[in-house]
Amino acid sequence: MVSSQCSVANKNQTGKPFQKHLSLSISPPKSVLGDNLELQFSDVFGPMPEANSEEACDVAYDEPAVVYSRSHSLVGPSLVVSHSLKMNKLTLRETEDSVDLVECVEGESIKENDEFSGNDDTDSEKSPEEVSGVVGIEDFEVLKVVGQGAFGKVYQVRKKDTSEIYAMKVMRKDKIVEKNHAEYMKAERDILTKIDHPFIVQLKYSFQTKYRLYLVLDFINGGHLFFQLYHQGLFREDLARVYTAEIVSAVSHLHEKGIMHRDLKPENILMDVDGHVMLTDFGLAKEFEENTRSNSMCGTTEYMAPEIVRGKGHDKAADWWSVGILLYEMLTGKPPFLGSKGKIQQKIVKDKIKLPQFLSNEAHALLKGLLQKEPERRLGSGPSGAEEIKKHKWFKAINWKKLEAREVQPSFKPAVSGRQCIANFDKCWTDMSVLDSPASSPNSDAKANPFTNFTYVRPPHSFLHRTTSNL
């Protein structure tokens, strides 16, 4: 998994530039300035749940805790350019370890100093020839850096034989193993192979070398939702309605496949050339079974559901809370809970939420349903799942069949000049050298290698292949 978070030396500074900029964004009409509707959520939500949350579900999935602070997207611009430059320098210094074995990205190819292999997959069950269309690093030309995370970088690349443009996540095995994130990384790759939806970024290829893992995905160059929200301040309800409907459709698809995303936030939602949203970054996603709970602490603090914060186990209902926070942010310009990590977590569990009066009654009702502190009472958690959200009166104008056929056009389209356009990416990334930091070799024992059977090639008849091949 490549983390969506940059290293920050001073945690107390996290969120301050973000809060400052959003607070200066577009304001509602003067007649409602400062006039917020304070919800008595004890009436809506009922009393706080008891400490025991295991009555109906078995606790499962004992995983390492992964809690992100609000930061930039891996395949989009960062919040604040000057702040992201500072974080970028800190990240580079942290990752440039002194090691003997080196693999680097340079110019058109990726070179390993001691050994070159186009696809050094340690799959013992099948040879590369048995995987039709298998690719290696020599099949791609590296163009630009478009993101960086805890385990490596994200590049804009061109496939040499077709000239198609992709995003390539390059992740260091030594860092993944060191942080005990191998299971998250394997889950991300496995989950991406099972998804085919018009509003979810697709995995096209995956492979590995001795030192690194590679995920080759759709390159979505309209920027991420936060980038547009940052520039526009907040969205009109009609535009937010389309975006939210597309997000609901994507999350519903995941839940039908038995997958929780667990890190829904504007930085993980991209925009394509037509203005449609594209859900990305499945580094914290988890496959689940009904009537089981994940007992891990994971996600981005501002978007965590109360049950995750309490550490009492969570299920797919946690995603619907995050959708509610996303909608709140789209309509108001900022998430409902701000402050330090600890303060935000306290507010999530205990505080009332204030809804501005300028929002429609229907928007109020939907937010109340999604932001239920008790997961069993949350909209979308019932037997009909996402259908009760889709039938909500705020979505009355949405034709869901047309929406999922990409026939409902958002009123806003990002400025994109072509498939290779990087105008919607922060220059702190695109001006970065494509030279990658050194990487040491992980445990070479094949029995201990957690990355076997990593190679993947997406079949040609996927949804996005059909809809974008003629662009």
UniProtKB/Swiss-Prot annotation:
Q: Does the keyword S-adenosyl-L-methionine apply?
A: no
Instruction: Say which domain of life the source belongs to.
Output: Eukaryota
List positions binding ATP.
146-154, 169
Record-listed E.C. numbers: 2.7.11.1
- Protein kinase domain residues: 140-395
Q: Which residues cross the membrane?
A: none
**Activity regulation, short description:** Activated by PDK1.
Q: Which reaction does it catalyse?
A: L-seryl-[protein] + ATP = O-phospho-L-seryl-[protein] + ADP + H(+); L-threonyl-[protein] + ATP = O-phospho-L-threonyl-[protein] + ADP + H(+)
One term under GO cellular component: nucleus
Q: Which residues carry this modification: Phosphoserine?
A: 296
Q: Which UniProt keywords apply?
A: ATP-binding, Kinase, Nucleotide-binding, Phosphoprotein, Serine/threonine-protein kinase, Transferase
PTM comment for this protein? Undergoes serine-specific autophosphorylation. Phosphorylated at Thr-455 by TOR.
PTM-bearing positions, type Phosphothreonine = 455
- What does it do? Downstream effector of TOR signaling pathway. May be involved in adaptation of plant to cold or high-salt conditions. Mediates the phosphorylation of MRFs (e.g. MRF1).
Q: Which family does it belong to?
A: Belongs to the protein kinase superfamily. AGC Ser/Thr protein kinase family. S6 kinase subfamily.
Q: How does it assemble?
A: Interacts with TAP46. Binds to MRF1.
Q: What is this protein called?
A: Serine/threonine-protein kinase AtPK2/AtPK19
